[in-house]
Amino acid sequence: MAIDVKAIEEHIRGILIALGDNPEREGLKDTPKRVAKMYEEVFKGMCYSNDEIAEMFNITFEDDLCINDNENDMVFMKEIEIFSHCEHHLALMYNMKVAIAYIPKGKIIGLSKMARIADMVGRRLQLQERIGSDIAEILQKITGSEDVAVIIEGEHGCMTTRGIKKSGTKTITTTLRGKFNTDPIISNKLMMLYTK
């Protein structure tokens, strides 16, 4: 799906008028174009389904991987910084840090790909909970592992700048699949790494 930049420009111009401002004045003349260009960038992830993102970043390594028999070895990455926009208010979700873990099943994904997946999934109108589910689903497709965990911490503009206005409030969500949801030893290991 392509983003309709021209339609965004027209609607932003309409919003400026609805707000009681003049879209022809010097400071606003190019605003619809700028906003449309910004939306094209910050909502890039909306152009791709989870399957397409999985295909885009489906580069794995198998030859160099030593597989242990216990199948409890874990790949863990944290502090992946992303942003997103809440689908309810279009408010910014910011200071978001994503942690991703998985137990390899014969192949591993490049570390930069994990960060790129998190970034691309964030570039949609989202819920924090869905960001975690989308990342987990994509990682499962690429690695073939059912054992995936995603922990996300972030601040929501809809909580900090409007309504209740509680700045500094952080939301933490977890998405646990496979052994991360059923094996207490694996789950404890994950939380130990996350809080370290």
UniProtKB/Swiss-Prot annotation:
<dbReference type="GO" id="GO:0046654">
    <property type="term" value="P:tetrahydrofolate biosynthetic process"/>
</dbReference>
<keyword id="KW-0479">Metal-binding</keyword>
<comment type="similarity">
    <text>Belongs to the GTP cyclohydrolase I family.</text>
</comment>
<feature type="binding site">
    <location>
        <position position="158"/>
    </location>
    <ligand>
        <name>Zn(2+)</name>
    </ligand>
</feature>
<keyword id="KW-0342">GTP-binding</keyword>
<keyword id="KW-0378">Hydrolase</keyword>
<keyword id="KW-0862">Zinc</keyword>
<comment type="pathway">
    <text>Cofactor biosynthesis; 7,8-dihydroneopterin triphosphate biosynthesis; 7,8-dihydroneopterin triphosphate from GTP: step 1/1.</text>
</comment>
<comment type="subunit">
    <text>Homomer.</text>
</comment>
<dbReference type="GO" id="GO:0006730">
    <property type="term" value="P:one-carbon metabolic process"/>
</dbReference>
<dbReference type="Pfam" id="PF01227">
    <property type="entry name" value="GTP_cyclohydroI"/>
</dbReference>
<dbReference type="GO" id="GO:0005737">
    <property type="term" value="C:cytoplasm"/>
</dbReference>
<dbReference type="InterPro" id="IPR001474">
    <property type="entry name" value="GTP_CycHdrlase_I"/>
</dbReference>
<dbReference type="InterPro" id="IPR043134">
    <property type="entry name" value="GTP-CH-I_N"/>
</dbReference>
<dbReference type="InterPro" id="IPR043133">
    <property type="entry name" value="GTP-CH-I_C/QueF"/>
</dbReference>
<dbReference type="GO" id="GO:0006729">
    <property type="term" value="P:tetrahydrobiopterin biosynthetic process"/>
</dbReference>
<dbReference type="GO" id="GO:0008270">
    <property type="term" value="F:zinc ion binding"/>
</dbReference>
<dbReference type="InterPro" id="IPR018234">
    <property type="entry name" value="GTP_CycHdrlase_I_CS"/>
</dbReference>
<feature type="binding site">
    <location>
        <position position="89"/>
    </location>
    <ligand>
        <name>Zn(2+)</name>
    </ligand>
</feature>
<dbReference type="GO" id="GO:0005525">
    <property type="term" value="F:GTP binding"/>
</dbReference>
<dbReference type="GO" id="GO:0003934">
    <property type="term" value="F:GTP cyclohydrolase I activity"/>
</dbReference>
<feature type="binding site">
    <location>
        <position position="86"/>
    </location>
    <ligand>
        <name>Zn(2+)</name>
    </ligand>
</feature>
<keyword id="KW-0554">One-carbon metabolism</keyword>
<keyword id="KW-0547">Nucleotide-binding</keyword>
<protein>
    <recommendedName>
        <fullName>GTP cyclohydrolase 1</fullName>
        <ecNumber>3.5.4.16</ecNumber>
    </recommendedName>
</protein>
<dbReference type="InterPro" id="IPR020602">
    <property type="entry name" value="GTP_CycHdrlase_I_dom"/>
</dbReference>
